[in-house]
Amino acid sequence: PFDFTRRRLSVVVSDGKKKQLITKGAVEEILSICTMVDYKGEVSDITRDIKQNILKITKDLNKQGLRVVAVAQKNDITDVKDFSIKDESKMVLMGFIGFLDPPKESAKGAIERLNQDGIRVIVLTGDNEYVTKAICEKVNINTDKIILGSKVEKLSDAEVEAKRS
């Protein structure tokens, strides 16, 4: 299952001859476990510049409302029974996938009706701030007060209350 702490999921697959570890997850997390990148069939060291370029592309996709997941792999896993988180290292970045999960067509109208009735809509999501902002803008939810979960945890009750108003 997906591990929300590590923000990734790994599986071991076998074709009968070799075992392969495949890991998918948050781009930043996958980049942190990759030492190589497969680009157009050529495997090479993943440099700081390559990582920064991937993060820039990912951010641009997020701003368009796309969620992005990275995929990495590692060949020749020795024993599946002894597989552990430690095996999620020195992996090869295979690529990343952007997908759109747009709000339902009825969402914008429903939110407008709630606002007209004096009900303020608050969004809680596991998405990053760029995806959240793009989706909220599509349904006319104010994006001036986006607070990341990691920051909410550090706020006092009084600070949270001040941000709500």
Regions found by a protein language model. Name each.
Residues 9-165:
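Cytosolic catalytic headpieces and adjacent flexible linkers of membrane translocases
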Residues 1-3, 162:
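Short Gly/Pro-enriched turn/cap motifs at secondary-structure boundaries
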Residues 5-7:
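A short, compositionally biased
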